[in-house]
């Protein structure tokens, strides 16, 4: 390709709403063009990037034994009702009605469609296992689309679905997909972490996310200093807590030794002041968290959570706790002071004693770190009073769950070394769906005993368009994009410094033909522009490398620059065969 024929328009300035460098560079480099909120066109350079990513993903998926299909972008709403997700998914699911009053959705994910395919195709265990995948556009009606391709409303995704006769085979395929995704990310030259994750609206269990490490990542990852453990903060675990965190101790770290008693605590409404009042570490206090749980029909109720005073509640964990038995709640919101008072409680003095009797609440949960704990201080459900000497082992029927957020300094559940936070961009997610969808949609097969069984399913998503900003957030520099060779739009750009110099022109054009004949994807920059402009474009667009044909040619020299690190190589240009060997060796 000759640069003069390339449909691209680079910009010096970034759009005002482009916060992340990936968004800025993709717009400035002419890779993408915004046409609506969270909706982008992919111009030739952007489309070629997508094709490179698609090729890697398809090659690795096919190698794993999966088969590619293509499902409709539009899905009948009845399939989503059949699975039970039509109401559960919320307003991110774009719904519409056609001229015949038939209801449809734009698919953000395709579990329902693939289950429908399997239901009408798979009849016997002899047809299993089966793994089908597609690479297709999706639509999620994000409330606040932002950060360019990182969180758009329309996006391109590889979503795969596997079907099995038993859980052992699902586990095998899950491991195969984990290894496949690792190979994909390694081929793209990325530093990443595989972490435990929450299954969210997809459902199922055994969920893992693939995080590209980057400071701007939306996800907080909890990572161990001593082993390979890692988890999204929403699903992170920690070793049992038996003492305050050493780095947070402010008052006496020992358990307060006091008989059970009711104390007058005037205007002591938060954990900080409670800890100061009794001169004890916050670890020995109980923090009450009151939330309003929202159902699909917009009905709501107050739910109650208790954690150690030096902990915070983790919202996803808390939502999972109340959904453990009914799975009818969509979200949690902070309860207002008025709502708490209407329940008969005083803000700042809420405690475990008599709570169910006062509020008639269905959902009251205690964090696992409080299981059978003693020597505690909690609210007395009475204004200006707290209880000391609280012993939860004397309570009957308490429901415990992992609802606290793991904090830096907590200990790893696997090796007991310290945990710390880092940031990541989720680019892949794999799930063990089990029979969640097959039971709901009656997708069955006959086992080897002739008995009807629900299909066992797995689900595997990879963000084709999202990986582009992820690469840039990790790899790019202050000058522009940096793409690895496998992803770069062109393997090498030949930049003719002075197009008015016939020697430079002839040499550059001849080398362009030689490299192209060798199967190298080459861009010949023969534009009548200043050399500085051409170099700025090379740095912005991030092609893997560039060969500079300039004044050095008079002395039999050309210069090769690798975009990552801008490392320079001076090459002898007198023998084109030797020069070709050197170029191929460096850009390999």
From Swiss-Prot:
Keyword terms of this UniProt record: Aminoacyl-tRNA synthetase, ATP-binding, Cytoplasm, Ligase, Nucleotide-binding, Protein biosynthesis
Catalytic reaction list: tRNA(Pro) + L-proline + ATP = L-prolyl-tRNA(Pro) + AMP + diphosphate
InterPro entries: aa-tRNA-synt_IIb (IPR002314), aa-tRNA-synth_II (IPR006195), aa-tRNA-synth_II/BPL/LPL (IPR045864), Anticodon-bd (IPR004154), Anticodon-bd_dom_sf (IPR036621), Pro-tRNA-ligase_IIa (IPR002316), Pro-tRNA-synth_IIa_bac-type (IPR004500), Pro-tRNA-Synthase_IIa_type1 (IPR023717)
Keyword Acetylation set for record: no
Any Pfam family the entry gives: tRNA_edit
E.C. no: 6.1.1.15
Keyword match ATP-binding: yes
Subcellular location field: Cytoplasm
Domain of life assignment: Bacteria
Gene Ontology biological-process entries: prolyl-tRNA aminoacylation
A GO term for molecular function: proline-tRNA ligase activity
PROSITE patterns: AA_TRNA_LIGASE_II (PS50862)
Domain free text: Consists of three domains: the N-terminal catalytic domain, the editing domain and the C-terminal anticodon-binding domain.
PANTHER family: MITOCHONDRIAL RIBOSOME PROTEIN L39/PROLYL-TRNA LIGASE FAMILY MEMBER (PTHR42753), PROLINE--TRNA LIGASE (PTHR42753:SF2)
HAMAP family cross-referenced by the UniProt entry: Pro_tRNA_synth_type1
Subunit structure: Homodimer.
Role, per record: Catalyzes the attachment of proline to tRNA(Pro) in a two-step reaction: proline is first activated by ATP to form Pro-AMP and then transferred to the acceptor end of tRNA(Pro). As ProRS can inadvertently accommodate and process non-cognate amino acids such as alanine and cysteine, to avoid such errors it has two additional distinct editing activities against alanine. One activity is designated as 'pretransfer' editing and involves the tRNA(Pro)-independent hydrolysis of activated Ala-AMP.
Similarity comment text for this entry: Belongs to the class-II aminoacyl-tRNA synthetase family. ProS type 1 subfamily.
Protein's name in the database: Proline--tRNA ligase
Species in which this protein is naturally found: Helicobacter hepaticus (strain ATCC 51449 / 3B1)
Lineage, top ranks: Bacteria, Pseudomonadati, Campylobacterota, Epsilonproteobacteria, Campylobacterales
């Amino acid at each position: 390709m000759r640069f003069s024929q390339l449909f691209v328009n680079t910009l010096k300035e970034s759009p005002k709403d482009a916060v992340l460098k990936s968004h800025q560079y993709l717009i400035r480099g002419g890779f993408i063009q915004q046409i609506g909120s969270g909706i982008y066109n992919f111009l030739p350079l952007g489309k070629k990037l997508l094709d490179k990513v698609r090729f890697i993903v398809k090659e690795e998926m096919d190698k794993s034994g999966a088969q590619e299909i293509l499902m409709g972008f539009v899905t009948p709403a009845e399939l989503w009702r059949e699975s039970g997700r039509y109401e559960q998914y919320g307003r991110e699911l774009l719904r519409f009605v056609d001229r015949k009053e038939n209801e449809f959705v734009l698919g953000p994910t395709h579990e329902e469609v693939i289950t429908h395919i399997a239901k009408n195709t798979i009849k016997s265990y002899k047809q299993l296992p089966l793994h089908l995948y597609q690479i297709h556009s999706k639509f999620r009606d994000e409330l606040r689309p932002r950060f360019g391709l990182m969180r758009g409303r329309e996006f391109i995704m590889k979503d795969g679905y596997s079907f099995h006769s038993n859980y052992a085979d699902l586990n095998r395929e899950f491991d195969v997909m984990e290894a496949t995704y690792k190979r994909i990310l390694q081929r793209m030259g990325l530093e990443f972490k595989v972490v435990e994750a929450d299954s969210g609206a997809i459902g199922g269990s055994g969920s893992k996310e693939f995080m590209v490490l980057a400071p701007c990542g939306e996800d907080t990852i909890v990572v161990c200093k001593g082993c390979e453990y890692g988890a999204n903060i929403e699903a992170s675990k920690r070793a049992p807590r038996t003492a305050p965190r050493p780095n947070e101790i402010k008052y006496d770290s020992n358990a307060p030794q006091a008989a059970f008693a009711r104390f007058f605590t005037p205007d002591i409404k938060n954990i900080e002041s409670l800890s100061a009042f009794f001169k004890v570490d916050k670890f020995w206090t109980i923090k009450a968290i009151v939330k309003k749980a929202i159902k699909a029909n917009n009905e709501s109720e107050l739910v109650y959570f208790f954690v150690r005073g030096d902990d915070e509640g983790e919202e996803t964990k808390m939502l999972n706790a109340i959904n453990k038995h009914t799975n009818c709640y969509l979200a949690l919101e902070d309860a207002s002071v008025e709502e708490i008072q209407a329940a008969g409680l005083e803000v700042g003095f809420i405690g475990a004693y008599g709570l169910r009797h006062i509020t008639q609440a269905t959902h009251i949960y205690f964090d696992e770190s409080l299981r059978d704990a003693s020597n505690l201080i909690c609210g007395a459900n009475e204004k200006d009073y707290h209880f000391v000497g609280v012993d939860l082992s004397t309570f009957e029927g308490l429901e415990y769950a992992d609802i606290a957020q793991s904090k830096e300094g907590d200990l790893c559940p696997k090796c007991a070394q310290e945990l710390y936070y880092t940031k990541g961009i989720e680019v892949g997610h794999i799930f063990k769906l089990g029979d969640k969808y097959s039971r709901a949609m009656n997708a069955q097969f006959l086992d080897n005993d002739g008995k009807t069984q629900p299909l066992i399913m797995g689900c595997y998503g990879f963000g084709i368009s999202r990986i582009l900003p992820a690469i840039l957030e990790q790899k790019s520099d202050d000058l522009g994009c940096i793409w690895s060779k496998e992803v770069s739009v062109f393997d090498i750009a030949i930049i003719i410094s002075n197009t008015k110099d016939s020697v430079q022109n002839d040499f550059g054009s001849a080398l362009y033909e030689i490299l192209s004949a060798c199967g190298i994807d080459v861009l010949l920059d023969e534009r009548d522009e200043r050399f500085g402009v051409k170099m700025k474009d090379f740095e912005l667009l991030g092609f893997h490398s560039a060969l500079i044909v300039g004044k050095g040619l008079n002395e039999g020299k050309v210069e090769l620059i690798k975009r990552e690190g801008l490392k320079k190589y001076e090459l002898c240009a007198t023998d084109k065969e030797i020069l070709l060997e050197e170029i191929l060796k460096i850009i390999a």
